[in-house]
Amino acid sequence: MLEFLRGRDVLVAGWGISGRSLVEPLRDIGAHPVVTDSGAKALAEAAELGLEVATSVELESADLSRFALVITSPGWRPDSPVLVSAVTEGIPVWGDVEFAWWVDQARIYGPVRKWLVVTGTNGKTTTTQMTHAILRAAGIASVACGNIGLPILDALRRNPGPQVLAVELSSFQLHWAPSVRPEAGVVLNVAEDHLDWHGGLDAYAAAKARALVGRIGVVGLDDPVAAALARRSKARRTVGFRVGVPADGELGVVDGKLLDRAFTKAAILAEVGDISPPGPAGVADALAAAALTRAIDVAPQFVKEGLQEHKVGPHRAAFVREVAGVEFIDDSKATNPHAARSSILAHPHVVWIAGGRLKGAAVEDLVEEVADRLVAAVLIGVDAPVIAAALARHAPEVPVVEVRAGDDAVMADDPLRPDEADAVMAAAVRTAAGYARAGDTVLLAPAAASLDMFADYTHRGRSFADAVHALEDGDIGRQP
């Protein structure tokens, strides 16, 4: 499949983590990588490595016929001028995941691996980590890769190489990877997110459904959109999971135990109390990871051991500190309303810190559903007014405070300087602490992306934690 690239030029569109991972594999198959990016710094870095570079502006009006293939960063939209030009000229456009799939199928770096693919609006990283933990417990050489941080190509090039890949894939990556056929793939849930990129919920869901095309497809039955995808699944067999009593062919929960009725008559897999993070969302992720690993015949005892060993990563419903009886929880990874909903519903009394860039997602349903849990809301970021308006409609009795940088700087298109963003977060945390009383939870669950203010969600979470650690007992309950 890759022979057509030998001796040919391949355009690498985007010099990020995925773009960098492409260079050596392209050279290993005899292709000549050419890098394009909209950033001068990125192109300078590529040029310093001896790579041929071209600006995206230059290529928009150039003849692209010299290229046998364009491999795009997952963040590049299909309507990007360079990609549109390539398609118009009949040049195939792949994502780095698509290329990695064919590199694996061609055995460039050893025997073909089993791919266990995880996608969904929320819970992808936790499920991928759980899957990897179970595989490790079973003694299976494996690696967690993809959207979780390690490019798949880098995972394939490891020596000794893994037998199984636990692959987290975003909707962007799946859009550009039509050939991937995983051994098993799961769609955890589907809620409004990245609609500005995909153009609508139907297209977004269709991208997620590309995980359901291999030997085993797995869907989250508690999510109506994901459950509906089961009917469209192209997998040879499709099973479901629910945080409730499972029917035949499902995984679920009975009397506090995770139960498999899909791959055997009935097997206990783990105790709900062993799951990290606790709560329905964590249990759902554990069921998904169990389904993926049971699909490749991992024994129940190793599912149990892996889930017991797994601990939630940073910024995912992570406990930061208790101050004067008030818990402070960092769920900065809750970057959309669906994730924020699960986070808020895990606590009875919440002072909610939210806001950022909503990316076209609606918050009306979220606010209406969690209104009775809210003690107060402290809002930051460019779309704070949108959340404030929803709170005014559906939770008018809840105190709402918008915290902004000076002169509305938070509303600017460019991110704030790190010190400015940290100052806004510190003010938000102090304000939230003032509304909290013993027994309450101050919860950072933004329901929005971070890039209007912060470098990424990890920066936002660190900023929150730093502000929490600066609090004193006297900061609690200062508001009337």
Curated annotation (Swiss-Prot):
Keyword entries, A-Z: ATP-binding, Cell cycle, Cell division, Cell shape, Cell wall biogenesis/degradation, Cytoplasm, Ligase, Nucleotide-binding, Peptidoglycan synthesis
Recorded metabolic or biological pathway in which this protein acts: Cell wall biogenesis; peptidoglycan biosynthesis
InterPro entries referenced in this protein's UniProt entry, alphabetically: Mur-like_cat_sf, Mur_ligase_C, Mur_ligase_C_dom_sf, Mur_ligase_cen, MurD
Localization (cell): Cytoplasm
A biological process from GO: peptidoglycan biosynthetic process
Keyword presence, Cell wall biogenesis/degradation: yes
Gene Ontology molecular function: any one: UDP-N-acetylmuramoylalanine-D-glutamate ligase activity
Enzyme Commission code: 6.3.2.9
Residue positions binding ATP: G120, T121, N122, G123, K124, T125, T126
Matches recorded under Pfam families: Mur_ligase_C, Mur_ligase_M, MurD-like_N
GO cellular component: cytoplasm
Catalyzed chemical reaction(s): UDP-N-acetyl-alpha-D-muramoyl-L-alanine + D-glutamate + ATP = UDP-N-acetyl-alpha-D-muramoyl-L-alanyl-D-glutamate + ADP + phosphate + H(+)
Domain of life: Bacteria
Major enzyme class: ligase
Main function: Cell wall formation. Catalyzes the addition of glutamate to the nucleotide precursor UDP-N-acetylmuramoyl-L-alanine (UMA).
The family this protein is said to belong to: Belongs to the MurCDEF family.
Name of this chain's protein: UDP-N-acetylmuramoylalanine--D-glutamate ligase
